[in-house]
Swiss-Prot record:
HAMAP family assigned: PyrG
CDD domains: CTPS_N, GATase1_CTP_Synthase
Binding site for UTP: S13, K186, T187, K188, P189, T190, Q191, K222
Protein name: CTP synthase
One Pfam match: GATase
Function: Catalyzes the ATP-dependent amination of UTP to CTP with either L-glutamine or ammonia as the source of nitrogen. Regulates intracellular CTP levels through interactions with the four ribonucleotide triphosphates.
The species this protein was found in: Pseudomonas putida (strain GB-1)
Catalysis: reaction(s): UTP + L-glutamine + ATP + H2O = CTP + L-glutamate + ADP + phosphate + 2 H(+); L-glutamine + H2O = L-glutamate + NH4(+); UTP + NH4(+) + ATP = CTP + ADP + phosphate + 2 H(+)
Stretch forming the signal peptide: none
Residues the entry annotates as binding L-glutamine: G351, L379, G380, M381, Q382, E402, R469
GO biological process, one term: 'de novo' CTP biosynthetic process
Annotated positions binding Mg(2+): D71, E139
Modulation of this protein's activity: Allosterically activated by GTP, when glutamine is the substrate; GTP has no effect on the reaction when ammonia is the substrate. The allosteric effector GTP functions by stabilizing the protein conformation that binds the tetrahedral intermediate(s) formed during glutamine hydrolysis. Inhibited by the product CTP, via allosteric rather than competitive inhibition.
Stretches assigned to the Glutamine amidotransferase type-1 domain: 290-541
Length: 542
């Protein structure tokens, strides 16, 4: 039977519930337990797919094609369980499902209410998402006291009663601020946060005390006394220089022992040697490179969370400190390519819309003409094709129909038909809704022997995740290939271009898929590892 650890946050947002939850999950997995994780988001959007990156950050795409919260990326980087559409749901998704059932008459004319209908649907999805895991960690987004979170908190209160205390526990993250002028930490915010939880029938079993200073033993004793939590379950979690230290920090304080004993689980001790190696490689690099990352959402770097982590993983794999130079593509439009000078490689990530695209195209041209290693992802591949068409082919009006529907040379256009991961045919047109209408999820890709990308993966066929609705225009592709554009990756049916390279360039690879979604700190990712190696070669050459 599955045991549940419900994770809530108090006092302020952005305390790191996702990282703390994933770190505990990693320790439990290291003890031989089967672990999964869920994220419950209180916002009313059906999913984050149409939300602004400036508001929500990255949209993480699962293997089965769900557009989900970026915390699922943390989950997959810390544990080896692959997330699915069942591991993340929102208030909007819950209400959509309940209202659809009401319209069908499934409730037999009953008055639909938050309790029991909404809370029952939340509980049903938690149980379904947990599956057959030994332990499921369920993170509730937002902060205790938010009106949006109330149905979720009520649902977990009910579920705790239904499954019993031997199968459910509550872990609460809270802020313990350090007052520099007084030279001490303050426990009052934590006391009030727990008081808020207890007022709705939820008693925490574990408190994770976030602070920029260690929470000393006397403060932990005081917190335990006022919150009715065992002193050994009051955990100090201060800021660290790498998040991959956190499993070790929690393990050193006995959190996993407490959980295992509380649930009555029989399992081995935790082997965290893999995490020790990750931390050692991260903190003791032997090399250093600078990579210019040219994007359009630089005001909120969470928009590129998985990509930034993937570059860190590539650094770990190569024992290299990767310095990312964040450059807004609009700044290149206004200030020119001087912003790129001195970079050992250039990375252009995905994005949507016209703003900043010309700056990205200029960055591609700089990389191609100056033989600087280049990696383009999603839109980064599309702008690479546009740049090639304009500056090698001489098609000065070349563009994507996303940006110019009247382009005389639309080298990138809307995908109107493709097969999804199950083999079912998907069709789209310009009038399709924005939400949930992209080519999403894992797709097989055939790689050309002898190509740079094949050298990285060492395979003929790979599987990577996608999130796009535009592709290279096959009608103009033969002319691009004749001029020297190398198509080194195609969809399984050969219909869609997945990877392009530049002939006569030391390392120029652009892919339509998002390899960052499958990169992990323990295993890295072959494409990013190859990119960092190319950057090292470029630096050594200089």
């Amino acid at each position: 039977m599955t045991r549940y650890i419900f994770v809530t946050g108090g006092v302020v947002s952005s305390l790191g519930k996702g990282i703390a939850s994933a770190s505990l999950a990693a320790i439990l997995e290291a003890r031989g337990l089967k672990v999964t994780m869920l994220k419950l988001d209180p916002y009313i959007n059906v999913d984050p797919g149409t939300m602004s990156p400036f508001q929500h950050g990255e949209v993480f795409v699962t293997h089965d094609g769900a557009e989900t919260d970026l915390d699922l990326g943390h989950y997959e980087r810390f544990i080896r369980t692959t997330m699915t559409q069942n591991n993340n749901f929102t208030t909007g998704r819950i209400y959509e499902h309940v209202l659809r059932k009401e319209r069908r008459g499934d409730y037999l004319g009953a008055t639909i209410q938050v309790i029991p209908h909404i809370t029952d649907e939340i509980k049903r999805r938690i149980i379904k998402g947990a599956g057959d895991a030994d332990v499921a960690l369920v993170e509730i987004g937002g902060t205790v006291g938010d009106i949006e979170s109330q149905p979720f908190l009520e649902a977990i209160r009910q579920l705790r009663v239904e499954v019993g205390s031997k199968r459910a526990m509550l872990m609460h993250l809270t802020l313990v601020p350090y007052i520099a002028t007084a030279g001490e930490t303050k426990t009052k915010p934590t006391q009030h946060s727990v008081k808020e939880l207890r007022s709705i029938g939820l008693q925490p079993d574990v408190l994770i005390c976030r602070s920029d200073h260690p929470v000393d033993a006397s403060s932990r004793r005081k917190i335990a006394l006022f919150t009715n939590v065992e002193e050994r379950a009051v955990i100090s979690l201060e800021d660290v220089d790498t998040i991959y230290k956190i499993p070790g920090v929690l393990h050193a304080q006995g959190l996993d022992d407490f959980v295992v004993e509380r649930f009555g689980l029989q399992c081995n001790g935790a082997d965290l040697s893999e995490w020790d190696k990750v931390v050692d490689a991260k903190l003791n690099p032997e090399h250093e490179v600078t990579i210019a990352m040219v994007g359009k959402y630089m005001e909120l770097l969470d928009a590129y969370k998985s990509l930034i982590e993937a570059m860190s993983h590539a650094g770990i794999t190569n024992r290299t400190k990767v310095n990312l130079r964040y450059i807004d593509s609009e700044d290149i439009e206004n200030q020119g390519t001087s912003l790129l000078e001195g970079a050992d490689a250039i990375l252009v990530p995905g994005g949507f819309g016209l703003r900043g695209v010309e700056g990205k195209i200029t960055a591609v041209q700089y990389a191609r003409e100056n033989k600087v290693p280049y990696l383009g992802i999603c839109l980064g591949m599309q702008v690479a094709v546009i740049e090639f068409a304009r500056n090698v082919m001489g098609w000065k009006d070349a563009n994507s129909t996303e940006f110019d529907r009247n382009s005389g040379h639309p080298v990138v256009g809307l995908i109107t038909e493709w097969a999804d991961a199950t083999g079912a045919v998907e069709t789209r047109d310009e009038a399709s809704d924005l939400g949930g209408t992209m080519r999403l999820g894992a797709q097989d890709c055939q790689l050309a022997a002898g190509s740079k990308v094949h050298d990285c993966y060492g395979k003929d066929v790979i599987t990577e995740r996608h999130r796009h609705r535009y592709e290279v225009n096959n009608n103009l592709l033969p002319q691009l290939v004749d001029a020297g554009l190398v198509v080194s990756g195609r969809s399984e049916d050969g219909a869609l271009v997945e990877v392009v390279e530049s002939k006569d360039h030391p390392w120029f690879v652009a892919c339509q898929f998002h390899p960052e979604f499958t990169s992990t700190p323990r295993d890295g990712h072959p494409l990013f590892s190859g990119f960092v190696k190319a950057a090292l070669a470029q630096k050594n050459k200089a």
